Amino acid sequence: MNKKQLAIVLWFWLVTAVACGGTAENNTAVAPTAEGAGEVASGVYADGAFKIVATTTQAYDVAQILTEGVPNIEITPLMGAGVDPHLYQPTESDIAAMNEADMVIYSGLFLEGQFDTIFAALREQGVLIHAMSDPVKQGGFTIGGFELSDELVDVDDPHFWFDPRNWELTITDLGEALAEIDPENSQTYAENATAYAAMMTPLYEWANEGLRKVPEGQRHLVTSHDAFQYFGAAFGWQMEAIQGLSTEDEAGVGDIQGTVDFIIAN
Protein backbone atom coordinates (compact mmCIF):
# COMPACT_ATOMS: atom_id res chain seq x y z
CA MET A 1 0.00 0.00 0.00
CA ASN A 2 1.61 3.28 -1.12
CA LYS A 3 1.46 6.67 0.63
CA LYS A 4 -1.46 7.87 -1.49
CA GLN A 5 -3.52 4.82 -0.59
CA LEU A 6 -2.61 5.23 3.08
CA ALA A 7 -3.76 8.85 2.97
CA ILE A 8 -7.12 7.74 1.59
CA VAL A 9 -7.47 5.17 4.37
CA LEU A 10 -6.70 7.77 7.06
CA TRP A 11 -9.03 10.35 5.53
CA PHE A 12 -11.95 7.95 5.54
CA TRP A 13 -11.20 6.90 9.10
CA LEU A 14 -11.54 10.55 10.08
CA VAL A 15 -14.80 10.93 8.15
CA THR A 16 -16.19 7.86 9.91
CA ALA A 17 -15.30 9.33 13.30
CA VAL A 18 -17.28 12.47 12.50
CA ALA A 19 -20.20 10.98 10.56
CA CYS A 20 -20.86 8.08 12.90
CA GLY A 21 -20.33 10.19 15.62
CA GLY A 22 -23.74 21.11 12.32
CA THR A 23 -26.42 25.62 11.55
CA ALA A 24 -30.11 28.37 10.09
CA GLU A 25 -32.65 28.61 12.94
CA ASN A 26 -36.24 30.01 13.44
CA ASN A 27 -39.55 28.75 11.68
CA THR A 28 -43.41 28.65 11.44
CA ALA A 29 -45.65 26.52 13.51
CA VAL A 30 -47.78 23.47 13.16
CA ALA A 31 -49.94 21.67 15.65
CA PRO A 32 -49.48 17.89 15.52
CA THR A 33 -52.56 15.70 15.66
CA ALA A 34 -52.77 12.43 17.58
CA GLU A 35 -51.74 10.56 14.44
CA GLY A 36 -48.66 12.73 14.07
CA ALA A 37 -49.91 14.79 11.14
CA GLY A 38 -49.59 18.54 11.43
CA GLU A 39 -52.13 21.31 11.11
CA VAL A 40 -50.87 24.85 10.78
CA ALA A 41 -51.54 26.89 13.89
CA SER A 42 -52.09 30.64 13.73
CA GLY A 43 -48.58 31.42 12.50
CA VAL A 44 -46.74 30.08 15.52
CA TYR A 45 -47.23 27.84 18.52
CA ALA A 46 -48.48 29.28 21.76
CA ASP A 47 -44.91 29.56 23.02
CA GLY A 48 -43.81 31.27 19.81
CA ALA A 49 -41.79 28.52 18.12
CA PHE A 50 -42.08 25.27 16.22
CA LYS A 51 -39.59 23.02 18.00
CA ILE A 52 -37.55 20.48 16.06
CA VAL A 53 -35.12 18.04 17.64
CA ALA A 54 -32.44 16.50 15.38
CA THR A 55 -30.63 13.41 16.64
CA THR A 56 -27.42 13.46 14.57
CA THR A 57 -25.27 16.16 13.01
CA GLN A 58 -26.56 15.14 9.57
CA ALA A 59 -30.15 15.58 10.72
CA TYR A 60 -29.28 18.94 12.28
CA ASP A 61 -27.57 20.21 9.13
CA VAL A 62 -30.37 19.29 6.74
CA ALA A 63 -33.01 20.69 9.11
CA GLN A 64 -31.20 24.01 9.30
CA ILE A 65 -30.70 24.25 5.55
CA LEU A 66 -34.31 23.41 4.68
CA THR A 67 -35.81 25.78 7.27
CA GLU A 68 -33.60 28.75 6.42
CA GLY A 69 -35.72 31.85 5.96
CA VAL A 70 -38.75 30.48 7.81
CA PRO A 71 -39.46 32.31 11.08
CA ASN A 72 -40.03 30.89 14.54
CA ILE A 73 -38.39 27.48 14.38
CA GLU A 74 -36.07 26.22 17.09
CA ILE A 75 -33.78 23.33 16.15
CA THR A 76 -32.06 21.40 18.93
CA PRO A 77 -29.28 18.90 18.12
CA LEU A 78 -28.75 15.95 20.46
CA MET A 79 -25.37 14.64 19.28
CA GLY A 80 -22.32 16.73 18.49
CA ALA A 81 -19.60 16.03 15.94
CA GLY A 82 -17.61 12.91 16.76
CA VAL A 83 -20.38 11.31 18.82
CA ASP A 84 -21.13 7.69 17.90
CA PRO A 85 -24.90 7.32 17.30
CA HIS A 86 -24.69 3.53 17.52
CA LEU A 87 -23.68 3.74 21.17
CA TYR A 88 -25.27 7.04 22.21
CA GLN A 89 -27.59 6.79 25.20
CA PRO A 90 -30.23 9.55 25.39
CA THR A 91 -29.74 11.74 28.44
CA GLU A 92 -32.49 13.13 30.66
CA SER A 93 -32.15 16.49 28.91
CA ASP A 94 -32.43 14.77 25.50
CA ILE A 95 -35.64 13.04 26.54
CA ALA A 96 -37.00 16.31 27.94
CA ALA A 97 -36.21 18.11 24.66
CA MET A 98 -37.94 15.41 22.61
CA ASN A 99 -40.97 15.48 24.91
CA GLU A 100 -41.27 19.22 24.31
CA ALA A 101 -40.63 18.94 20.56
CA ASP A 102 -43.19 19.21 17.81
CA MET A 103 -41.02 17.19 15.43
CA VAL A 104 -38.05 14.84 15.79
CA ILE A 105 -35.80 14.18 12.79
CA TYR A 106 -33.63 11.08 12.97
CA SER A 107 -31.59 8.91 10.62
CA GLY A 108 -33.23 5.51 11.07
CA LEU A 109 -32.32 1.94 10.08
CA PHE A 110 -31.21 1.33 13.69
CA LEU A 111 -28.45 3.96 13.51
CA GLU A 112 -29.77 5.46 16.75
CA GLY A 113 -30.16 2.04 18.32
CA GLN A 114 -31.01 3.28 21.83
CA PHE A 115 -33.92 5.49 20.74
CA ASP A 116 -36.56 3.05 19.44
CA THR A 117 -38.71 2.81 22.58
CA ILE A 118 -38.53 6.59 23.04
CA PHE A 119 -39.70 7.21 19.47
CA ALA A 120 -42.63 4.82 19.96
CA ALA A 121 -43.73 6.72 23.06
CA LEU A 122 -43.35 10.08 21.33
CA ARG A 123 -45.52 8.95 18.42
CA GLU A 124 -48.27 8.06 20.87
CA GLN A 125 -48.02 11.62 22.22
CA GLY A 126 -48.54 13.05 18.73
CA VAL A 127 -44.95 14.17 18.14
CA LEU A 128 -43.99 14.07 14.46
CA ILE A 129 -41.20 11.49 14.04
CA HIS A 130 -39.41 11.71 10.67
CA ALA A 131 -36.87 9.09 9.54
CA MET A 132 -34.45 10.47 6.95
CA SER A 133 -33.77 6.96 5.63
CA ASP A 134 -37.41 6.24 4.72
CA PRO A 135 -37.25 7.36 1.04
CA VAL A 136 -34.01 5.40 0.55
CA LYS A 137 -35.62 2.29 2.00
CA GLN A 138 -38.84 2.78 0.07
CA GLY A 139 -36.91 3.34 -3.16
CA GLY A 140 -35.09 0.03 -2.77
CA PHE A 141 -31.66 1.65 -2.48
CA THR A 142 -30.59 0.26 0.90
CA ILE A 143 -27.88 -2.38 1.26
CA GLY A 144 -29.24 -5.15 3.46
CA GLY A 145 -28.80 -8.63 4.77
CA PHE A 146 -26.74 -7.77 7.86
CA GLU A 147 -27.04 -9.28 11.34
CA LEU A 148 -26.71 -6.90 14.27
CA SER A 149 -27.73 -9.32 17.01
CA ASP A 150 -29.71 -12.50 17.63
CA GLU A 151 -32.87 -10.37 17.51
CA LEU A 152 -31.91 -8.07 14.63
CA VAL A 153 -31.19 -10.11 11.52
CA ASP A 154 -31.36 -9.27 7.82
CA VAL A 155 -31.21 -5.54 8.58
CA ASP A 156 -30.12 -2.70 6.32
CA ASP A 157 -26.89 -0.74 6.51
CA PRO A 158 -27.82 2.61 8.13
CA HIS A 159 -24.95 4.62 6.59
CA PHE A 160 -26.93 5.52 3.47
CA TRP A 161 -25.64 9.11 3.19
CA PHE A 162 -22.27 7.98 1.81
CA ASP A 163 -23.95 7.85 -1.60
CA PRO A 164 -24.93 11.46 -2.47
CA ARG A 165 -27.83 10.17 -4.56
CA ASN A 166 -29.41 8.75 -1.41
CA TRP A 167 -28.96 12.05 0.40
CA GLU A 168 -30.80 13.79 -2.44
CA LEU A 169 -33.79 11.55 -1.71
CA THR A 170 -33.57 12.49 1.96
CA ILE A 171 -33.50 16.22 1.18
CA THR A 172 -36.50 16.06 -1.13
CA ASP A 173 -38.55 13.92 1.25
CA LEU A 174 -37.89 16.11 4.29
CA GLY A 175 -38.64 19.25 2.29
CA GLU A 176 -42.00 17.79 1.27
CA ALA A 177 -42.75 16.75 4.86
CA LEU A 178 -42.04 20.24 6.19
CA ALA A 179 -44.15 21.83 3.44
CA GLU A 180 -47.07 19.55 4.30
CA ILE A 181 -46.77 20.34 8.01
CA ASP A 182 -46.42 24.09 7.42
CA PRO A 183 -48.12 25.00 4.11
CA GLU A 184 -47.83 28.74 4.82
CA ASN A 185 -44.08 28.40 4.21
CA SER A 186 -44.22 25.57 1.67
CA GLN A 187 -42.61 27.67 -1.07
CA THR A 188 -39.57 28.42 1.10
CA TYR A 189 -39.14 24.77 2.04
CA ALA A 190 -39.47 23.75 -1.60
CA GLU A 191 -36.94 26.34 -2.78
CA ASN A 192 -34.45 25.37 -0.08
CA ALA A 193 -34.86 21.66 -0.82
CA THR A 194 -34.54 22.16 -4.58
CA ALA A 195 -31.36 24.23 -4.21
CA TYR A 196 -29.76 21.79 -1.77
CA ALA A 197 -30.78 18.67 -3.72
CA ALA A 198 -29.37 20.19 -6.91
CA MET A 199 -25.90 20.04 -5.34
CA MET A 200 -25.96 16.25 -4.99
CA THR A 201 -25.68 15.17 -8.63
CA PRO A 202 -22.60 17.36 -9.31
CA LEU A 203 -21.10 16.09 -6.05
CA TYR A 204 -21.68 12.48 -7.06
CA GLU A 205 -20.27 13.05 -10.56
CA TRP A 206 -17.20 14.86 -9.20
CA ALA A 207 -16.50 12.12 -6.66
CA ASN A 208 -17.16 9.34 -9.16
CA GLU A 209 -14.77 10.83 -11.71
CA GLY A 210 -11.99 11.31 -9.19
CA LEU A 211 -12.33 8.05 -7.29
CA ARG A 212 -12.48 5.92 -10.43
CA LYS A 213 -9.13 7.34 -11.54
CA VAL A 214 -7.62 4.97 -9.01
CA PRO A 215 -6.95 1.70 -10.90
CA GLU A 216 -9.71 -0.82 -10.24
CA GLY A 217 -7.38 -3.35 -8.64
CA GLN A 218 -6.20 -0.72 -6.15
CA ARG A 219 -9.60 0.56 -4.99
CA HIS A 220 -9.43 -0.83 -1.47
CA LEU A 221 -10.66 1.06 1.58
CA VAL A 222 -9.71 -0.16 5.07
CA THR A 223 -11.63 1.29 8.02
CA SER A 224 -12.11 0.57 11.69
CA HIS A 225 -15.90 0.26 11.28
CA ASP A 226 -17.89 -1.11 8.34
CA ALA A 227 -19.64 2.14 7.45
CA PHE A 228 -18.76 2.56 3.77
CA GLN A 229 -20.73 -0.10 1.88
CA TYR A 230 -22.79 2.59 0.14
CA PHE A 231 -19.61 4.44 -0.80
CA GLY A 232 -18.11 1.24 -2.20
CA ALA A 233 -21.21 0.40 -4.20
CA ALA A 234 -21.49 3.94 -5.58
CA PHE A 235 -17.88 4.39 -6.63
CA GLY A 236 -16.59 0.87 -7.23
CA TRP A 237 -14.39 0.38 -4.17
CA GLN A 238 -13.82 -2.74 -2.08
CA MET A 239 -14.34 -2.37 1.66
CA GLU A 240 -12.50 -4.04 4.53
CA ALA A 241 -13.30 -3.22 8.17
CA ILE A 242 -12.22 -4.45 11.58
CA GLN A 243 -15.60 -3.89 13.24
CA GLY A 244 -18.97 -4.74 11.77
CA LEU A 245 -21.93 -2.63 10.73
CA SER A 246 -22.41 -1.26 14.24
CA THR A 247 -19.66 -0.07 16.57
CA GLU A 248 -21.39 -2.16 19.23
CA ASP A 249 -19.71 -5.14 17.57
CA GLU A 250 -16.51 -6.15 19.34
CA ALA A 251 -13.54 -6.86 17.11
CA GLY A 252 -11.73 -10.09 17.90
CA VAL A 253 -8.20 -11.22 17.18
CA GLY A 254 -9.44 -12.97 14.06
CA ASP A 255 -10.99 -9.74 12.75
CA ILE A 256 -7.75 -7.83 13.24
CA GLN A 257 -5.69 -10.59 11.66
CA GLY A 258 -8.06 -10.74 8.70
CA THR A 259 -7.65 -7.00 8.15
CA VAL A 260 -3.87 -7.27 8.39
CA ASP A 261 -3.88 -10.09 5.84
CA PHE A 262 -6.07 -8.00 3.52
CA ILE A 263 -3.71 -5.02 3.72
CA ILE A 264 -0.66 -7.19 3.04
CA ALA A 265 -2.37 -8.85 0.09
CA ASN A 266 -3.43 -5.56 -1.46
Each PLM stretch: what is its role?
Residues 1-9:
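Bacterial N-terminal signal peptides that target proteins for export
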Residues 9-17:
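Bacterial N-terminal signal peptides
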